[in-house]
């Protein structure tokens, strides 16, 4: 199964068209200078990473009348040491077409890929930690899911969520319409957890799950007994998380438990315990280092 098939073609076409129009609102001065002779450009991975975002790159150059020849697939690793020559960038793809069109798509395509690959690389490395591929591995592999959050870049969410999926992670909810998440402000506005969940169920019906953010065991119990499907245990330390989640699973085995709040790659192992089903991390999409990727026209 190809993850990129999640995105309808018309949606991709619309997004890319808007981004291209944003970059060239009127004259293409640089393109006029170089002309329209056919050239070949190499897409180069200049540091270690895990690749993602090909569907966006491909659509950019489709709209610009260029051909892309791929040498890597989404989810595959690339590095500077690939092949017989050391410290040489790995060639990820060739782009063939009118030189002015290649240059139109250059910066937009690289902005997307460097961000997308950065998120996928970060997610892949975090997933390895809980999969037991390192020295910190716990005695038994954790069977839960690592998820992102809604802390995404406005207008760029599809790229970032697809990058998480490519890393083997969960997107969490895509938007406010995907699942009902009741946080502290919702609860304070409604007065208590029970009323908040009741109101949410009356508008969400049977088809939408309800998740409630809880700060302690009593709040979690109230949320469960009010009919929540998922309880987020927010900003718990590992010891308290172990105690509370164990109690909740013993008394309410049907409930899905999520740990969230301040969890990083340095601490995730402490939160990956059997009674936790989901670990969500905002830093999977916020503050992620970009991967250095370039597109170079080849001299003839």
UniProtKB/Swiss-Prot annotation:
Disulphide bond pairs: none
Residues involved in quinolinate binding: 107, 150-151, 172-173, 183, 213, 234, 260-262, 282
BP-aspect Gene Ontology terms: NAD biosynthetic process; quinolinate catabolic process
SUPFAM superfamilies per UniProt: Nicotinate/Quinolinate PRTase C-terminal domain-like, Nicotinate/Quinolinate PRTase N-terminal domain-like
A molecular function GO annotation: nicotinate-nucleotide diphosphorylase (carboxylating) activity
Tree of life domain: Eukaryota
InterPro entries from the UniProt entry: Aldolase_TIM, NadC, NadC/ModD, Nicotinate_pribotase-like_C, Quinolinate_PRibosylTase_N_sf, Quinolinate_PRibosylTrfase_C, Quinolinate_PRibosylTrfase_N
Pathway: Cofactor biosynthesis; NAD(+) biosynthesis; nicotinate D-ribonucleotide from quinolinate: step 1/1
Cellular-component GO terms for this entry: cytoplasm
Keyword annotations of the record: Glycosyltransferase, Pyridine nucleotide biosynthesis, Transferase
Known catalytic reactions: nicotinate beta-D-ribonucleotide + CO2 + diphosphate = quinolinate + 5-phospho-alpha-D-ribose 1-diphosphate + 2 H(+)
Enzyme Commission designation: 2.4.2.19
Stretch list, region Important for hexamer formation: 5-9
Role according to the record: Involved in the catabolism of quinolinic acid (QA).
Complexes and interactors: Hexamer formed by 3 homodimers.
PANTHER family named in the record: NICOTINATE-NUCLEOTIDE PYROPHOSPHORYLASE [CARBOXYLATING]
Similarity comment text for this entry: Belongs to the NadC/ModD family.
Name of the featured protein: Nicotinate-nucleotide pyrophosphorylase [carboxylating]
The gene coding this protein: qprt
């Amino acid at each position: 199964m190809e993850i990129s098939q999640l995105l309808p073609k018309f949606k991709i076409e619309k997004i890319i068209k808007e981004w291209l129009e944003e970059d060239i609102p009127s004259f293409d001065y640089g393109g006029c200078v170089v002309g329209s002779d056919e050239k070949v450009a190499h897409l180069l991975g200049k540091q270690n990473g895990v690749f993602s975002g090909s569907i966006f790159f491909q659509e950019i150059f489709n709209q610009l009348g260029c051909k892309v020849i791929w040498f890597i697939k989404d989810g595959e690793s690339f590095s500077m040491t690939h092949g017989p020559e050391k410290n040489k960038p790995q060639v990820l793809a060739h782009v063939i077409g009118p030189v002015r069109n290649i240059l139109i798509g250059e910066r937009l395509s690289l902005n997307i890929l460097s961000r997308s690959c950065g998120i996928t690389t970060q997610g892949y490395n975090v997933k390895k930690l809980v999969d037991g591929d390192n020295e910190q591995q716990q005695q038994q592999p954790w069977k839960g899911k690592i998820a992102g959050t809604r802390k995404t870049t406005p207008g760029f969410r599809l790229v970032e969520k697809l990058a998480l999926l490519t890393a083997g992670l969960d997107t969490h909810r895509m938007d406010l319409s995907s699942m009902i998440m009741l946080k502290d402000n919702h609860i304070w506005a409604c007065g208590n957890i029970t009323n908040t969940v009741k109101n949410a169920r009356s508008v969400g019906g049977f088809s939408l799950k309800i998740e409630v953010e809880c700060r302690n065991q009593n709040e979690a119990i109230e949320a469960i007994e009010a009919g929540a499907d998922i309880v987020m245990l927010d900003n718990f330390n590992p010891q308290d998380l172990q105690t509370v989640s164990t109690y909740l699973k013993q008394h309410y085995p049907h409930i899905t438990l999520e740990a969230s709040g301040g969890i990083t790659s340095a601490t995730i192992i402490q939160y990956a315990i059997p009674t936790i089903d989901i670990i969500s991390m905002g830093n999977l999409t916020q503050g992620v280092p970009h991967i250095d990727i370039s597109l170079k026209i080849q001299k003839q």
